[in-house]
Amino acid sequence: MKIMRKTHPLMKMVNHAFIDLPAPVNISGWWNFGSLIGLCLIIQIASGLFLAMHYTADTTTAFSSVAHICRDVNYGWLIRSMHANGASLFFVCLYLHIGRGIYYGSYLYKETWNVGILLLFMVMATAFMGYVLPWGQMSFWGATVITNLLSAIPYIGPDLVEWIWGGFSVDKATLTRFFAFHFILPFIIAAMAMVHLLFLHETGSNNPLGIPSNCDKIPFHPYYTFKDLLGVMILLGLYLTLVLFFPDLLGDPDNYMPANPLNTPPHIKPEWYFLFAYAILRSIPNKLGGVIALVLSILVLALFPLLHTSNQRSLTFRPISQFLFWILVSDLFILTWIGGQPVEPPFIMIGQVASILYFSIILILLPIAGLIENKILKW
């Protein structure tokens, strides 16, 4: 009898991707985050769908519709809390996934890496637009400040901003289109994630040693399905603890006030997962320069394959590069902290130094470290 999973056209695809997929024997827990991001995306789409059933994308009723979800809809408070905190967990998994890619040299799979960068931009855009939807104070002012940055683009900037707003300020048209985009983008992200996987399965997974593992592979199921399941259990434990015990820990209290165009909050800041980029934006006293630095802070990831100078793929046996990598991680924590602070001394200077260090490590120090390590190993 033929095995159905190996012959059925649809199941054959699933089989090649998740069951009979040859996987390196030595991949560690850092390889769990891909599946965890997938889980986060499923949770976000499911919870978002139920929220969209009760939400109204209108400036007069958006805020009260969110209050209605929390008060009157069965388990609405839970669905909203899951969706809001699910975004935070999504970004935690994303950043750890990217960090893993940098540490172990996974960026040398150029197609997979570039699709990943595109996915990151799409997830960031989706999260930003989602933050605008509750129409609280920080939603409104965050949308105003961030969309206004586009006015720094020479010549077309001001027209571009008005085109995105659908008027002369952030208003009903802006909210409606943001809701439409926020709804459709996750499905495009899911499709792009499939492309990401397609490219990955063309080459096979990398491993902690950064060496070819074709001679030593094991099937994905049952070994890595159960390993991923452990990651899922840990993630869900952390997730439910956050959702049920500390639902407002990562939110901004200002967003519990309805949007008021006549009253600016004392400190306008995005959600915690954008603070590092926000700090880089603010560290440059020129508007256009700040916007360029903001885009480059993410786009610089695309340069990793080009700036790889070492003869070894991963950082496992490269102590100088390891040291720089962890300095970079610390620097990102500092930038995240600075992004949430007011624009005053000493925070301005700390932010500027941290921003310079961020780009210096990636563009200058890591490539030099790779060359030095080659020399030390006489390669």
Curated annotation (Swiss-Prot):
It comes from Liomys spectabilis (Jaliscan spiny pocket mouse). InterPro entries: Cyt_b/b6_C, Cyt_b/b6_C_sf, Cyt_b/b6_N, Cytb/b6-like_sf, Cytochrome_b, Cytochrome_b_C_euk/bac, Cytochrome_b_N_euk/bac, Di-haem_cyt_TM. GO terms for cellular component: mitochondrial inner membrane; respiratory chain complex III. The chain crosses the membrane at residues 33-53, 77-98, 113-133, 178-198, 226-246, 288-308, 320-340, 347-367. Keywords: Electron transport, Heme, Iron, Membrane, Metal-binding, Mitochondrion, Mitochondrion inner membrane, Respiratory chain, Transmembrane, Transmembrane helix, Transport, Ubiquinone. It is a multi-pass membrane protein. Heme 1 (or BL or b562) is low-potential and absorbs at about 562 nm, and heme 2 (or BH or b566) is high-potential and absorbs at about 566 nm. The cytochrome bc1 complex contains 11 subunits: 3 respiratory subunits (MT-CYB, CYC1 and UQCRFS1), 2 core proteins (UQCRC1 and UQCRC2) and 6 low-molecular weight proteins (UQCRH/QCR6, UQCRB/QCR7, UQCRQ/QCR8, UQCR10/QCR9, UQCR11/QCR10 and a cleavage product of UQCRFS1). This cytochrome bc1 complex then forms a dimer. Its cofactor is heme b. This is Cytochrome b. The keyword Ribonucleoprotein does not apply. A ubiquinone binds at residue 201. Pfam families: Cytochrom_B_C (PF00032), Cytochrome_B (PF00033). Binds 2 heme b groups non-covalently. GO terms for biological process: mitochondrial electron transport, ubiquinol to cytochrome c. Heme b b562 binds at residues 83, 182.
